[in-house]
């Protein structure tokens, strides 16, 4: 058996086409979704991510605003800018590109964003609402992962999901989202002693650790859905995931590639959250 490859780029394009239709309908009502992205400094990777977000906004018809600051900006000045955007009716989503310079406390910046405009889903209020199953903006990568699993038409309810990784960005929240879908969830991490025993029980395995090709066929239950969140660059310059793709291909039932797997879904879910925020706000642009 060779696994079915879940092509995240194709799923993302399909969802963006749906979002584009929604944006057209909103604009007919005088509502234009708007996203503000704050970029601090000149980090090439951050700038590349921001370009991807701008391109996504343009693709679906979202108004986007890029606000750039030098690396020397004070925390106070950055907080003042967030306050301004919180009060700007044209802006439905605020995103601060991480990481920030060391002299700026990321926690303070994230918590200053209004929960109504927290399209990244990182604000503690958003996290709390997610934990209790309330309606909120879900964190983009975890939400994208759940959507990819749903593409397999597998009934998540009652399935055993194993998550390798416990970061606040992916590992912890993705487990919670699957729990909200009535799955049984197990977390594995660097202190887990019997990892392979646990992962071989997984109907759905999520790998998000940042270790190239760590997960091999002997971690996988036959027919499992394997979602590879890792993006690692080898010495050859080639990108690879946390899963040894070729090794696992003959055991898994479904698998995401790297690249063109989880990555395209992250920005797509950001666009989704921005459109949802605009719907909730319902502010007609003049």
Curated annotation (Swiss-Prot):
| GO biological process assignments | L-histidine biosynthetic process; methionine biosynthetic process; purine nucleotide biosynthetic process; tetrahydrofolate interconversion
Annotated CDD domains: NAD_bind_m-THF_DH_Cyclohyd
Q: What EC number(s) has UniProt assigned to this enzyme? A: 1.5.1.5, 3.5.4.9
Quote the InterPro entries the UniProt record gives.
Aminoacid_DH-like_N_sf, NAD(P)-bd_dom_sf, THF_DH/CycHdrlase, THF_DH/CycHdrlase_cat_dom, THF_DH/CycHdrlase_CS, THF_DH/CycHdrlase_NAD-bd_dom
Q: Gene3D superfamilies of this UniProt entry?
A: Leucine Dehydrogenase, chain A, domain 1, NAD(P)-binding Rossmann-like Domain
Mind listing the UniProt keywords for this protein, alphabetically? Answer: Amino-acid biosynthesis, Histidine biosynthesis, Hydrolase, Methionine biosynthesis, Multifunctional enzyme, NADP, One-carbon metabolism, Oxidoreductase, Purine biosynthesis
**One GO CC annotation, please?**
cytosol
Any single GO molecular-function term of the entry would be: methenyltetrahydrofolate cyclohydrolase activity
> Which annotated residues bind NADP(+)?
165-167, 190, 231
Pathway named in the protein's UniProt entry: One-carbon metabolism; tetrahydrofolate interconversion
Q: What does the UniProt record say this protein does?
A: Catalyzes the oxidation of 5,10-methylenetetrahydrofolate to 5,10-methenyltetrahydrofolate and then the hydrolysis of 5,10-methenyltetrahydrofolate to 10-formyltetrahydrofolate.
Q: Belongs to which family?
A: Belongs to the tetrahydrofolate dehydrogenase/cyclohydrolase family.
Subunit architecture = Homodimer.
**Protein name from the UniProt record:** Bifunctional protein FolD
């Amino acid at each position: 058996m060779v696994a079915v490859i879940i092509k995240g780029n194709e799923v993302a394009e399909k969802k963006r086409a749906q979002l584009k239709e929604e944006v057209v309908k909103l604009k007919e009502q005088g509502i234009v979704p708007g996203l503000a992205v704050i970029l601090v400094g000149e980090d090439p990777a951050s700038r590349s991510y921001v370009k991807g977000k701008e391109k996504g906004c343009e693709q679906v018809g979202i108004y986007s605003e890029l606000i750039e600051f030098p690396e020397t900006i004070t925390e106070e000045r950055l907080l003042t800018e967030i306050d301004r955007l919180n009060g700007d009716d044209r802006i439905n989503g605020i995103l601060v590109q991480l990481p920030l310079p060391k002299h700026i406390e990321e926690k303070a910046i994230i918590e200053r964003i209004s929960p109504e405009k927290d399209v990244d889903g990182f604000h503690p209020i958003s996290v709390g609402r997610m934990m209790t199953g309330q309606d909120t903006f879900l964190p983009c990568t975890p939400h994208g992962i759940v959507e990819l699993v749903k593409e397999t038409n597998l009934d998540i309810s009652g399935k055993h999901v194993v998550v390798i990784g416990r970061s606040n960005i992916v590992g912890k929240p993705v487990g919670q989202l699957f729990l909200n879908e009535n799955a049984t969830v197990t977390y594995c991490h660097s202190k887990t002693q019997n990892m392979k025993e646990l992962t071989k029980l997984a109907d759905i395995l999520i790998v998000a650790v940042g270790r190239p090709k760590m997960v091999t066929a002997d971690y996988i239950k036959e027919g499992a859905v394997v979602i590879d969140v890792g993006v690692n660059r080898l010495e050859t310059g080639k990108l690879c995931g946390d899963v040894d793709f070729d090794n696992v291909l003959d055991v898994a039932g479904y698998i995401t590639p790297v690249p063109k797997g989880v990555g395209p879904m992250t920005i797509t879910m950001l666009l989704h959250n921005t459109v949802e925020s605009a719907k909730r706000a319902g502010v007609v642009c003049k």
